[in-house]
Design a protein with these regions (language model features):
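Noncatalytic linker/hinge segments flanking ATPase motor cores
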Residues: 63-71, 168-176, 191-197
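Conserved Lys-Pro-Asp/Glu-containing loop-to-beta segment of HAD-superfamily phosphomonoesterases
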Residues: 175-213
Length: 213
């Protein structure tokens, strides 16, 4: 994003014609009451949340490292030490055990139907997105994944055996704004740059049409 993007955000005189509303969700603590790693992954590694996060915070402090990088690498190291297989398939399997706040599983169909009734004859549509510091593969394996147009979350790099060996993508609280701009501009492929200026009227979903949970 550049200064022109910020100007677009501040310009309240731009008339948008887009009729899509984006509902953008964090995951842990928003859709699910616990960090997603607590479901499946940590039990498989014989770790309590207190043990795991305590060690992560200690290593973060000792090594002066980013906490998200530390927690992802710590999972790999623990799995290797225990001989526990971690790959895309196992992460998705663990994701299928994620529990939600009451009502979440039915929320998406209900709000979609509500929007249709609210719109009347207008052609308003709703799109759902996740921007999370959790693991993309786990979210892809959860029961509500089918409702999301795009899932932006942390990812691993995998070797030719399918074994994760280093973080490939980390989404911190600060960097989440980049992904809001991706939704805004309709540039959902994370390999595509969003730095080029795009006129407001060409943007897929204006910020006024976004609700962030």
């Amino acid at each position: 994003m550049d200064d022109r993007d910020l100007i677009v955000m501040a310009n309240d005189k731009v008339e948008f014609q887009q009729d899509t509303v984006a509902l953008v969700y964090d995951f842990d603590g928003t859709l699910s009451p616990q960090a997603m790693q607590h479901y499946g992954v940590l039990p498989a590694l014989d770790q309590t949340p207190e043990e795991f996060w305590g060690r992560v915070k200690e290593k973060r402090k000792d090594e002066g490292a980013e906490e998200l990088l530390v927690y992802m690498k710590e999972m790999i190291d623990l799995a290797d030490a225990k001989g526990e297989k971690l790959d895309r398939e196992s992460f998705r399997k663990h994701g299928s055990t994620i529990e939600y706040f009451e009502g979440v599983e039915h929320w998406f169909d209900r709000i979609d139907e509500f929007a249709k009734g609210l719109a009347g004859d207008a052609s308003i549509s709703i799109e759902h997105y996740v921007i999370s510091s959790g693991l993309k593969e786990m979210i892809e394996g959860c029961s509500i994944a089918k409702h999301f147009k795009s899932i932006f979350a942390c990812e691993f790099r995998y070797d030719h055996y399918g074994h994760p060996y280093w973080p490939a993508r980390v989404i911190s609280d600060t960097s989440k704004t980049q992904y809001l701009f991706r939704v805004n501009k309709g540039v959902l492929d994370v390999n595509d740059s969003i730095n080029s200026h795009m006129p407001a009227r060409e943007r897929a979903i204006p910020f006024d049409n976004m609700i962030y949970f």
